Amino acid sequence: MVVLDSVSTLRESIQKWRKAGLTIGFVPTMGNLHAGHLSLVKQARQKSDKVIVSIFVNPLQFGPDEDYDRYPRTFEADKALLQQHNADAVFCPSVDEMYPNGQAQTRVIAPEKMTSILEGAKRPGHFDGVTTVVAKLFNMVQPDIAILGQKDFQQFAVLQQMVEDLALSVELIRAPIVRDETGLALSSRNQYLTEIQRSVAPKLFVALQSIEMAIRSGNKNYSSLCQIATQQVLSDGFDAVDYIQVLNASSLEEPQQGDQALVIVAAAKLGQTRLLDNVLVSL
């Protein structure tokens, strides 16, 4: 596995692989890798000849009061895991390498109808930071496929829209959420949880499953289902619920009669830690 920290060395490797007619799979991450990330690497390995993983904690997607400075950076451990999982290259640029013009650089602005809701409502500017860095990474890596996790559901939908709108020649693949034995969705931020909070955390998924079962039983009063689930999560010990909603899985809009693919999305806080989760429902 090669470690690349500049755009020029990245492009040299890619050029060699392209000349040999090899396909490239790409997994963009912010590091602090866990089994969820590694499942993406495994899928990329199965679907492509060469696998590149990027590790870059992107300052553009963090707000002023968010956890950019304390976001876990575990590069040596990450590198060892990627080697074990047969990645071919890890791209780990500095902030200056990614953004030589600093804050003055060109931005990619995501569609407001998809970014003014859910995470976007809580984190203004977050998705413009995501689309900017991912568009730039796609341009640098030029992958055939990119594997992204389902846990950040809104992010996947926004990036899929970006790929379509900008006619980028990459296929996005959404990989299922990886959960621990309690049902908690794996996340780099789970390590912030205390032992007591960790025992409460899986109850968010339980609440989403109860909505799913009700929908499958024919209940279409989504607003009422989400209100009941919100009260349940709060009584289970969560400190706040930012949202629990049922949406069209493609457009992220309110479900319409006849929609076949729905997603139940949620964000809730335990102490200072925000947990995201979602459940897909195919009707």
Swiss-Prot record:
Pfam families named in the record: Pantoate_ligase
Pathway membership, UniProt: Cofactor biosynthesis; (R)-pantothenate biosynthesis; (R)-pantothenate from (R)-pantoate and beta-alanine: step 1/1
Gene3D superfamilies assigned to the protein according to its UniProt record, in alphabetical order: HUPs (3.40.50.620), Pantoate-beta-alanine ligase, C-terminal domain (3.30.1300.10)
Binding site for beta-alanine: 61
EC number: 6.3.2.1
Catalysed reactions, semicolon-separated: (R)-pantoate + beta-alanine + ATP = (R)-pantothenate + AMP + diphosphate + H(+)
EC top class, as a word: ligase
SUPFAM superfamilies: Nucleotidylyl transferase (SSF52374)
One annotated GO molecular function: pantoate-beta-alanine ligase activity
Active site: 37 (proton donor)
Chain positions recorded as (R)-pantoate binding sites: 61, 155
Predominant location category: cytoplasm
Positions with a binding annotation for ATP: 30-37, 149-152, 178, 186-189
Keywords: ATP-binding, Cytoplasm, Ligase, Nucleotide-binding, Pantothenate biosynthesis
Known function: Catalyzes the condensation of pantoate with beta-alanine in an ATP-dependent reaction via a pantoyl-adenylate intermediate.
General remark: The reaction proceeds by a bi uni uni bi ping pong mechanism.
Subunit composition and interactions: Homodimer.
HAMAP family: PanC
Family label: Belongs to the pantothenate synthetase family.
Protein name per Swiss-Prot or TrEMBL: Pantothenate synthetase
Native source species: Hydrogenovibrio crunogenus (strain DSM 25203 / XCL-2)
GN (gene name): panC
